[in-house]
């Protein structure tokens, strides 16, 4: 766990402002695990970003925002996409939630699809690893990321508040504006937020970008999002609803989709004309700024639209023996369009209805627990000349129970979950599949002393294959009929005969804390049978690499370390030292290394924090990844220097926050081994960032 140092509760998309150093670790109240009150009370591996720490780390993508946590990394696909990688696992093995319900986007379908969650609107982000993920599906073998944004007020605010923020990001010449308002009238609470972001092509290290330039072409982004929510509060609980929307347009770096313009079918259109259209975006201005040295030739862009409706009810003690009932219903209309130049390649659509209902029962002796049911119905389609996944209807039913038991210095936790997945390709283009999966976990935490705790857990998880793993290019049996996925410039071949993926996880941790410091270390292993892997076959068809979903045994082993300590004081400000490191290794039964794993990584930070200001210097480094997997490219070692300062000014009862930081101060060329585009798209170069916020 990390020591959390926050002086105030601020709007978390705004600047971090002044973070006060308090003695001892602060405990975050968990939303994702209803049984537990804080991160210190669970045997499960849990991390939470809140307050000033969240504001400091917030980025435009979810993966980049939480990449500072131990064991968590970012799988970028250009600056517009950042998917979380937890303990080496990603994609369908990591479940992204928004207020406890699935984000219901297409991020699990492909690495080029963004997670339809806006981190800059978050109040907190909770990351669960290990057995706790059973609450949200046995398929979340890697972990669960829950973004809590308060769009449905769970309590009546004491007074009306208005927060306005602005942020400038130097590397992308991007500007983000946010507004948030909350208030109450009698027993009704209200919430409103909105965000607008525009950025140009991102700058990278000298000579590392498009055609040897210092920028990545076609990486501009435009995003608008917001939500409107309300809740009615009564003696025994509340009921609330919210509507939210997301409209985003982002480009995939030039070079990442070479070969995709040769025609949508691998064996056809060998002399396909390249599109030569300009996009009405910030890309054009930025191209001119860099001398107009690159042109768009069928650049691939993704236009994302999502409309979401949420209903939530909490009832305290609805009947004898039940402490709390929690009900969640979410309706999502998601669509994104892959554009090549001005032409539509594929339109992805996902319409889903999901319900989740929990009962927290009263203690039975020393046993306390939660049980529930989760149901969903999703229609997914990919339409267009370049569509390579058939329309499918997916129905899911899940039953789960999680119990804990306290006995002296021991706390035990046990969970069980059963899921049934029906996946039905529309029109009979492939065989329908039904999967029954059963997952179980057992964990314990032992209090050695007031300062020392040791924890251990073991779980057995099962995951049903996903739609893209089963049905990508289904029915296209010859190379001439294979369809290239334009956004990734690859041919992706599914396997409708895939079996259930099974994993056995073991986790051992040691945690220490005192009034001025905290440290934790964990070691873990994941042993899979029927592990599903999108393997690079090494075959090239029509200039596109052929990747195939294959299945076999695999094993991951890893370790994490995290520590924070207050060294002393200087001019009434606390001097802090922060350390972190993690490593994971993965190998298939064939002896090949698992591709796109992060290398040995670490960070070291020196901080100085007072009541009204905060300063930091941080070095983050990654070793060379010389075990990239079969037919994959290795990456070099890298390091990054970040420095910054944050200040808070009071104007009566109102606060003004200002933050200034320099990220990648030495303009290093950084290529992440977790990125599918590491050969084409390095991470952003030197970036001078400025943020301002006003809290009324």
Positions of the model-derived regions?
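Face-selective signature of the C-terminal outer-membrane beta-barrel domain
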Residues: 233, 238-246, 303-449, 453, ...
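N-terminal periplasmic "start-of-domain" segments of outer-membrane beta-barrel proteins
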Residues: 25-57, 83, 91
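C-terminal beta-signal and adjacent terminal beta-strands/loops
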Residues: 205, 460-463, 529, 647-696
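Extracytoplasmic beta-strand/coil segments of soluble accessory domains associated
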Residues: 63-105
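Short acidic/polar hinge/loop motifs at secondary-structure boundaries
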Residues: 102-129
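Periplasmic-side early beta-strands and strand-to-turn transitions of outer-membrane beta-barrels
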Residues: 159-163, 169, 176-302, 530, ...
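Outer-membrane beta-barrel signature, preferentially recognizing the C-terminal barrel domain
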Residues: 290, 296-311, 318, 441, ...
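Gram-negative outer-membrane beta-barrel transporters
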Residues: 367-369, 410, 518-528, 545-628, ...
